[in-house]
Amino acid sequence: MQPERLIVFSRYPEPGKTKTRLASALGVEGAARLQREMAEHALSRARALAAERPVGLEVHYEGGSAGRMAEWLGPGLAYHRQVGGDLGARMENAFAEALRTGEEKVVLVGTDCPGITTTILRSAFNLLASFDLVLGPARDGGYYLIGLRNRVPHLFRSIPWGTAEVATRTLELATGLGLRAVTVDLLVDVDHPEDLPVWEREAGQTGELGPPRMSVVIPTLNEEEHLEATLESVTREPDIEVIVVDGGSSDRTAELALARGARLLTTTAQRARQMNAGAAAASAPVLLFLHGDTRLPPGFSGRALELLAGRGTAAGAFRLAVAGPGWGLRAIEGLANARSRLLHLPYGDQALFVTAELFRRAGGFPDL
């Protein structure tokens, strides 16, 4: 028995019974061939992960038989027919069986998102050391990956499968159950003819993308009004990992974060704990902590990285500018900027940045 298990959900590529929504563009034979290629693509990522860590690999299939699946995908895998009615029941049963036999971390992935990488799979297993639920959201509102370390049957029930609410509803249920949840990369799934360029682009990539230069951590609680503008200011720069740590918002904060491609964590509504949780999940060498109602200036990442590379610079922040007219706001700006310049005591609104190594050595933010 291995402590980690990776389950790949797939379907035997039988013409006329798979990828039917793509048949109008590819024909039934072409749609089946695409299903075959996408499953092989996803499985190659899974096998690459198994080559570097002791992960048990399983394929849970629909259509065909275990023998036909083995002829297609080869030996060295455990093949199981999917059991249950709807997708939720089939996933619930797969997790129940895996966790019943003693696995400590179980990740289940589909094969519809060609952007899946070994890095994402590795990250999912690593995050399960600190979180109860890991979710890989898809652009259409569903998810391509889910990871658990305990049985949580309610996560697969009362879900409107096949709608744009699947991922957000799952995260809402997780919050209600008191689970610590985190998302990995937002990916695009290939279900319709207009999605085919995504497959063509991803299938042509032979290497993995490099790591992000900076992780921006945004603690939130009901920030629907401001969050979209905040995320727009962050995501216009390349190689930035965006992590929204939500404290249980009752508005559309989580939905907006996912729509913008941010990773989403859920935890208790306490700012220091939220920022520490985001820092723990971050993968970049530099951390930037940003309030949900604050916008960053153009070129923020380059300037921050340049300053941190300088001798004697441990951390930094930006000048404060408050939106709106009036001498009172200008006075607040002036006092805040003077305080940070002269006393080296910036406010959180000024977007604090620091190397991840130094932040972790310092023990993070105090739990006040």
Task: Label each region the model flagged.
Residues 5, 213-215, 241:
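Cell-envelope/extracellular polymer assembly enzymes that use nucleotide-activated donors
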Residues 14-47, 222-236:
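Short, well-formed alpha-helical segments that are part of the catalytic scaffolds
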Residues 63-66, 233, 246-254, 294:
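A conserved acidic beta->alpha catalytic loop
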Residues 67-70, 225-229, 251-260:
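Acidic helix N-cap motif at the loop->helix transition within catalytic regions
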Residues 106, 287:
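Short aromatic/hydrophobic "clamp" motif used to bind/position activated sugar donors
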Residues 127-133, 298-328:
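Conserved donor NDP-sugar-binding/catalytic core segment of glycosyltransferases
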